Amino acid sequence: MWGYSPALDIQLEVNKSATNCLGECLEVLIVGAGDARHIVKTLASSYLYRDRIITYHVIESTLEQVARSMLLLSTCLEKDLGLQEATRYYLEIYGNTLVRPATAKYLVKHSDRLMDIPTNTIDCTWLSLENFKRRDKDRLEGIFKFWERATRENIPVVEYWDQRVRKSLKTRYDYRDGVFDWDYHMVLKSRDVSNLTVQEYRFWRNNGIAFTWLEGEPARSNPTLVSNIIQHGPGFIHYAYLGDITNGPFFTWGSEEVKINQNKYRATDIAEREIMRSIHEIRTKEPLCDELIASHRDSSILNGTLMIEMPSNAMEQESWKRERNKYRKDDIPWIDIKNQKVIFHPVTSLETLKCKTEYTSKFDFMWIAHNMTKQLPNLIPLVKKGAIVLVELRKYLVELREEDLENFVKELRDIGRKNGLREISDINAKKHYIAKFYKC
């Protein structure tokens, strides 16, 4: 449901390399990112570069991840949301099992709108689902319907989370805080994770709530984290929560170390700052000043001191009635994005694109997740000679030890060499979160 490396400005990565041709068009392939962070970051930074047509081709392993990426991108692009409002909606939906009531109401309303995209009922110029078959489009529509209904009915996502934790820890469940503290101090701290506090990490491991603020209590379930959603008659079946319960969503936006006036910010504060900056830059094409960021921040939350309690069961189980959200089909809620478009491809494309001549040597840049590296032989034919290929490393995976990190890098080097990739720079398994190659 999220990635394990920071958001990247793709144009910056391309421009840094002299091996790549800097043309008027940039064709990008993103495989298994788990979220839309690289697209958001690149959109935000576009004003820093000359005009260029950028097409993002995205392959995710599940339709739920496609739907979440659509929702998160839509939140960044929605023109009627306040800056802080959009930022916190994004982070809560992205990384929390429970969200504030205001966020839940937004999720209900927005899911109702997004379910019309797969059916082409509303025009969404920045997004294309044309490569999906009718069956997959129907499933996407069903996922949005499920989110709308499940948010109102407040399905017990925290219970699903606890069941996963119990199954994972078994006899160690009663001593879980000790397990979480050990993972934090002995693993994460040794890998240069600076702004993530032990309080944030422990609270997330216990309850699945990563990002918290003083204002508002997270009391409504976030069904966008539920896996394998299938419409069945008038209702739905799903596999509860099957996602990450050990690493966390902190490393995509909240891993940069920042100190101001000797105050050390939490991962939540860094993530809020980075998302706020990205949304502001997408909207205004201007940098965000630090004073504006500071105006949204309460000084009492510095130094990782903020702790929250879980809401009462009665509050969590309260149900909402369905109210059909009325909006005009020609009322476009998103800001106009010129020269950039996101095209989603089905997961079967991992095997089929190499057989289509129009995709041979098509891409100038490829980013691939750490758990998709076995697909490199299928994907390398799709990139141009001299293209940049970035591969996510496993630095932030808590369950892996240093030996595992080194073995992964060794295997990655072997796969790369066999498929015509050369390292742009040396790879340090413990320090680096990304490996950089080019196609020779």
Could you describe each region identified by the protein language model?
Residues 1-440:
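Domain-level detector for long C-terminal conserved domains
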